[in-house]
Amino acid sequence: AAYSRAELKALCDVLMRHDHVWIMTDDMYEHVIYDDFEFSTPAELEPGLHDRTITLNGVSKAYSMTGWRLGYGAGPVELIKAMVVVQSQSSTHTSSISQAAAVEALNGPQDFIAPHNDMFRERRDLVVSMLNQADGIKCLKPEGAFYVYPSCAGTLGKTAPDGTKIETDSDFCTYLLESEGVAVVPGVAFG
């Protein structure tokens, strides 16, 4: 869910050699981090990338405003101007009350974020622990966000107790939904 500073710096080093590549970061989970993870951005780690980096963020995750569809971007002026043109022709503005709430969320006290992250971390630890106890499932512990991305590779080619043959991650997800009532998204959906 997150790149360490060292991983991101290594990626920045590669990007510095390819000045035709633009960078777009999705920093929506900037504040939803765990285990002393240190958030960073390409433009911060490599100032030479600043002029070709667009940073996208919003209030959905850290401020529990999902569904409000409030976000913002920062980057080179010409790119932001182009975004404004596209946005003005493809969608209407966000409601004024949502905009006012977002301003208050961003400018108001931030002391609730740490307790929320503690709660998310406890849930993450429980889910990852339980997944890693399941036969055929392996799950790394993410350092940010509130999702996990377990591998079900150990279940492929096997037959479930009800006789269902599990050949793909989609088969596994369908089995979980139909037999256990658990809805998950297969990895194939993410490319």
Predicted regions and their residues:
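PLP-dependent class I/II
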Residues: 1-191
